[in-house]
Regions:
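Short acidic alpha-helix that forms the nucleotide-activated donor recognition element
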Residues: 225-229, 343-354, 375, 393
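Carbohydrate-associated surface elements
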Residues: 240, 261
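Conserved donor-binding/catalytic core segment of Leloir-type glycosyltransferases
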Residues: 271-302, 313
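Nucleotide-activated donor-binding/catalytic signature segment of Leloir-type glycosyltransferases, i.e.
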Residues: 313, 324-344
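Aromatic "clamp/platform" in nucleotide-sugar-dependent glycosyltransferases that forms part
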Residues: 362
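Short hydrophobic beta-strand element within catalytic cores of glycosyltransferases
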Residues: 379-382, 386-393
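Conserved acidic donor-binding segment of nucleotide-sugar-dependent glycosyltransferases
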Residues: 398-410, 419-424
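A charged, aromatic-enriched C-terminal amphipathic alpha-helix characteristic of glycosyltransferases
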Residues: 425-456
Length: 460
């Protein structure tokens, strides 16, 4: 399994899926090839590793910035120069040429980035496309973009029968490298559309100068092209995601829809919350910008003005400490009460205290939190991202299992919350619909059987 920024370092949807996935295949031995942002996370896990995990191979992107050159004078063939030039210019390279250069010929990335070939290419590129910038700024931007990627493709590749990556980004590069090196099947699973998510983040980012944003966005498009072209099968959680993958260049014949599943037996004993005069709303979510907790807080403040006896329980780890502090500051500024940050909890147990669930993310794939809410018979208010509308409304004739509203729209989110607060019979009916939908389409057993069949198919 090739993992990026998720298991076993942080809690979250992809991490929960990974843990349950490994757990569901006790007869399969796993090597976890984990990509993290910072080396300080080495060996610091939020999950206890399962018995069928034989090895955790860790690689951290910030180690690339500490890499030392060997001082070698490098010579490149015309083909190698051509593919390096494409990469630096943001055009699709022949990835296998680059893999051979850094894997077999053991070219040191720092030596390459100080070579006359590299300097000639980016000097020309700067003159042609970025003449208004200083060469120093341009050089260090390109270096910071390219060095982590090149560092990754120098890594020793663990041997496996199948390589399975959970994103098209850096993990997709490693999956492609493994496919090239050992000629074994490569499966790519996208829980969200990684390229689109990075694009949204970069457009809002303050750390990237405006005139470099397109370069960074294009880099992640190159990553997705690499992963899609090397993968034997590409899975998504819902049909709209498959359409996005095709738009990004994936061949239709490689695509599969493999929805997530939930262990419904964990929630079998969950009944309606006992009446206590309060309406309790839950958010099963890590504290991160992409989950848009601030809009949730603004919306809840509106709800609180309309309905006094209502509480908001935000259940999940702090993923972004700075954003968490900003959320606390916002709560103080608004003067809103009864918002409870619980930290990580046993969802199946805690959800017994809740009347319904809310999700205000600006980007999602197929949120596990919604499936868990449905399994517990809880209606949901969600933003219209990923497959949330598909989960809420369905096309199965069962009816609506909640309310789907536009992202970042605090007024409509608040109105949906108020509606479910004031209509207990309706939210219970919606919760029952959600439970039926999960039982029919989204169980863990169904999901795992889909992956087993896929593995058998690509190994033939």
């Amino acid at each position: 399994m090739i993992l990026e920024g998720s298991y076993p370092y942080v809690h979250g949807g992809v991490s929960s899926w990974t843990h349950q996935y490994i757990q569901a295949m006790p007869d399969t031995r796993f090597v976890l090839w984990c990509i993290g942002a910072e080396a300080k996370s080495r060996g610091v896990y939020k999950y206890e590793l399962l018995p069928n995990v034989d090895e955790v191979k860790e690689v951290f992107l910030d180690d690339a910035m500490r890499l030392k050159g060997r001082g070698r004078h490098l010579k490149f063939s015309d083909a190698e120069k051509g593919e390096l030039k494409k990469l630096f210019e943001g055009e699709k390279p022949e990835w296998d040429v680059l893999f051979e250069l850094f894997q077999e010929k053991k070219v040191n990335p720092v030596d390459m980035l100080m070579s006359p070939v590299f300097l000639d290419i980016i000097m020309q590129l700067c003159e042609e496309r970025f003449a208004y910038l200083s060469f120093t700024d341009f050089f260090y931007n390109v270096r910071s973009m390219i060095l982590p990627e090149l560092y990754l493709i120098t890594q020793e590749v663990p041997r496996a029968d199948i390589y399975h990556a959970t994103a098209t980004g850096y993990s997709g590069i490693l999956g492609s490298l493994a496919k090239w090196k050992y000629k074994k099947p490569f499966v790519l699973t996208e829980h969200g559309i990684y390229t689109r998510e990075r694009e949204e983040e970069l457009l809002r980012a303050q750390w990237v100068l405006p005139y470099f944003k397109n370069q960074w966005i294009n880099l992640f498009h190159l990553f997705s092209d690499c992963a899609y072209s090397h993968a034997d099968a590409v899975t998504a959680l819902f049909h709209r995601a498959n359409e996005a993958q095709m738009e990004l260049g994936c061949e239709k014949k490689k695509l599969r829809v493999t929805p997530n599943g939930v262990h419904i037996e964990r929630f079998a004993g969950v009944r309606d919350k006992k009446e206590d005069g309060w309406t309790d709303i839950g958010a099963i979510v890590r504290i991160a910008k992409i989950k848009d907790i601030k809009t949730m807080i603004y919306a809840f403040a509106e709800v609180k003005r309309e309905i006094g006896n209502v509480r908001l329980h935000i259940m999940g780890d702090v993923d972004d400490e700075e954003y968490y502090e900003a959320c606390l500051t916002l709560i103080r500024q608004l003067g809103v009460e009864d918002i409870i940050f619980t930290g990580s909890v046993d969802v199946a147990e805690y959800i017994k205290k809740l009347d319904f669930i809310i999700l205000t993310s600006i980007s999602e794939g197929q949120p596990l939190s919604v499936l868990e809410a449905f399994a517990a018979g809880r209606a949901c208010v969600t933003t219209d991202v990923g497959c949330c509308r598909e989960l809420i409304e369905g096309d199965d004739g069962l009816g609506a299992a909640g309310i789907c509203v536009p992202p970042m729209n605090k007024e409509q989110i608040a109105q949906a919350m108020i509606e479910l607060c004031r209509e207990p019979l309706e939210r219970k009916r919606m919760g029952a619909v959600g439970r039926k939908r999960v039982e029919k389409y989204y169980t863990h057993d169904i999901s795992m059987e889909n992956y087993r069949r896929l593995y058998e198919e690509i190994r033939v």
